[in-house]
A protein has these predicted regions:
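Charge-rich, N-proximal long alpha-helical rod segments
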Residues: 1-68
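Structured alpha/beta interaction-core segments
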Residues: 72-161
């Protein structure tokens, strides 16, 4: 008096016992091949991720070294020295080249203060703009720069609120 499960188990055991050695070897080799293929895909993905991270770090270090130049360009633009002429075109080319590499300038008056992207250098009294609660930016002393999501330099700002 055997149950159907016991009969099925005995049948599969007898099939495994009668299985040809080459079939077992082929199954083992297939499993090895699939495992190696998965390891290779993971390796390729890891290398691509590392390359992207290294590229972003390299661009970030170049931007860090160019920050004084970018600050001078911004000051010249604020003082009206870059309204036209060859220096204006050079400044525009530098900024557009950096934009192509994912460099973004940030920091604007009346935006909410965020300590992860702003560095508050001064606190002053001022009326809060409509729709802004809490601390907000009153003046941008030096803009901040990002490469992707990485903050290269926080925006240096004056805040109120």
């Amino acid at each position: 008096a055997s149950t159907p499960d016991e009969v099925a188990g005995e049948a599969s055991e007898s099939v495994e016992e009668n299985e040809h050695p080459d079939t077992k070897l082929a199954a083992e080799r297939l499993a090895d091949l699939q495992r190696l293929q998965a390891e290779y895909v993971n390796y390729r993905n890891r290398v691509e991720r590392d390359r992207a991270r290294e590229k972003e770090a390299t661009i970030g270090s170049v931007v860090e070294s160019l920050i004084p130049v970018l600050d001078d360009i911004e000051l010249a633009r604020q003082h009206g020295d870059l309204t036209e002429g060859p220096m204006s075109k050079i400044a525009d080319k530098i900024e557009s080249t950096l934009n192509r590499f994912g460099v973004a300038r940030f920091g604007a008056v009346d935006e909410a203060f965020d300590p992860s992207v702003h560095e508050a250098l001064m606190h002053v009294e001022a009326e809060a703009p409509e729709g802004v609660d809490g601390t907000f930016v009153v003046q941008v002393l030096q803009p901040g720069y990002k490469v992707g999501e990485r903050v290269v330099r926080p925006a240096r700002v004056s805040v109120a609120g």
